[in-house]
Amino acid sequence: MDKIKVGDKVRIIGKSRVHHCLAVPSTAEVVDTDFTCVKVFGYGYDGIMYDQWVSFVDVKPIRKAVVL
């Protein structure tokens, strides 16, 4: 699996390990990382932007298309 880095766009796919109020599914941007979690900035169910720590297992990288 590719390493998720700061600045990457990710899809929020679950809430298994870290409590967060982000909408699922939704997209968010990674603003910080540590060994088990990523801090993402994205929209919650109420339409307000939140920054939350989310477990790596709860996010899926959104890969950019490669232009040949």
Range-by-range predicted roles:
Residues 3, 9-68:
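Basic/aromatic-rich interaction segments and small domains that mediate binding to polyanionic partners
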